[in-house]
């Protein structure tokens, strides 16, 4: 028996949000768990995470144990789903599980785009653990990037920012590079005294190198008063501009009024110099562009894409934005306290 209108999944490299909503936009449940990127866990491993969260969501909504179909539409927008073959593999696996009558699978950047605009088209750039960009034209054409990291020319995720900060701190300490406040701020974050001590800790495994991703907010903060940190942030701005510019060019939108939405942990709340640099850089190629952070979470976009498939009207979409936005804010507060 169908129990919900939409099963929506925002599966990222650090966390997964799962929502159940009705066709009228009413939110039945929103739960959060660990990462579910197929790139890191494989398809079965990623869907095992989703399945566990789905059971939790069904219990929260008092909709039973999850046996059989749970929704009309399932929209799974997941990090690490970058090629059609990967989309197909996840879609087939979800269909085999029988969660929904209709299954849509795509990269999580599409969720950011849908969350940020009512137009249904535009460009979105996400910067979380990595960096990615998608574009959708008013005619339905897509512009995408493989987004596999350095092997596909990418730079600008939170990990890249953090690693650049660690490198700059080390070079400041030994004199190969300019002096920077990162020399003190970076090791202090890890409760060590010097960049050399930090390097030894990473080398010996006492400090997990993946934790450098946690330094992204520190880099943005230091950039206000430190030239080296500001240069790292300017590099990020140039990469965001390059991705969005190429997407706009492919879709022939450089002369059109068009929105570029920014999302992901690094860009979600971007303002000040970074936003200004992205805006001014893009306007050189697309003078009518509007650049802004998306106001809604990616899980909202995933759920809205499901409502789109159900042909839900504006009242249902507005209700979804309102209720799921409030539920997400509560989830974030609990996560922060925890």
Residue ranges and their predicted role:
Residues 1-66, 70-71, 95, 115-121, ...:
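ATP-binding/phosphotransfer module of carbohydrate and carboxylate kinases, centering on a glycine-rich
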Residues 81-180, 184, 321, 325-338:
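Phosphate-binding/catalytic loop of phosphoryl-transfer enzymes
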Residues 77, 106, 259-263:
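Solvent-exposed beta-strand sheet faces enriched in polar/charged residues
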Residues 73-82:
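Polybasic, low-complexity association/targeting segments
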């Amino acid at each position: 028996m169908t129990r919900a209108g939409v099963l929506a999944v925002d599966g990222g490299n650090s966390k997964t949000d799962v929502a159940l909503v009705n066709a009228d936009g009413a939110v039945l449940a929103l739960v959060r768990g660990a990462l579910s990127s197929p790139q890191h866990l494989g398809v079965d491993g990623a869907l095992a995470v989703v399945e566990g969260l789905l059971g939790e969501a069904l219990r929260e909504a008092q909709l039973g144990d999850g046996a059989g179909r749970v929704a009309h539409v399932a929209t799974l927008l997941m990090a690490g789903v970058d090629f059609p073959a990967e989309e197909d593999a996840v879609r087939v696996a979800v269909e085999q599980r029988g969660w929904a009558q209709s299954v849509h699978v795509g990269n999580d950047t599409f969720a950011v785009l849908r969350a940020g605009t009512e137009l249904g088209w535009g460009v979105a750039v996400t910067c979380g653990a990595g960096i990615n960009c998608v574009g959708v034209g008013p005619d339905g054409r897509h512009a995408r990037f493989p987004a596999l990291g350095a092997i596909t020319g990418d730079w600008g995720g939170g990990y890249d920012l953090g690693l650049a900060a660690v490198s700059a701190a080390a070079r400041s300490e030994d004199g190969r590079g300019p002096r920077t406040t990162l020399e003190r701020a970076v090791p202090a974050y890890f409760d060590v005294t010097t960049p050399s001590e930090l390097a030894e800790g990473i080398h010996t495994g006492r400090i997990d190198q993946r934790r450098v991703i946690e330094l992204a907010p520190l880099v943005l903060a230091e950039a206000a008063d430190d030239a080296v940190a500001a240069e790292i942030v300017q590099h990020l701005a140039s990469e965001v501009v390059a991705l969005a510019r190429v997407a706009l060019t492919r879709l022939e939108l450089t002369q059109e009024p068009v929105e570029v939405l920014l999302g992901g942990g690094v860009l979600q709340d971007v303002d000040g110099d970074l936003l200004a640099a992205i805006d001014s850089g893009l306007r050189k190629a697309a003078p009518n562009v509007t650049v802004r952070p998306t106001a809604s979470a990616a899980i909202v976009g995933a759920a809205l894409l499901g409502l789109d498939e159900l042909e839900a009207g504006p009242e249902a979409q507005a209700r979804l934005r309102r209720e799921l936005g409030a539920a997400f804010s509560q989830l974030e507060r609990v996560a922060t306290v925890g």
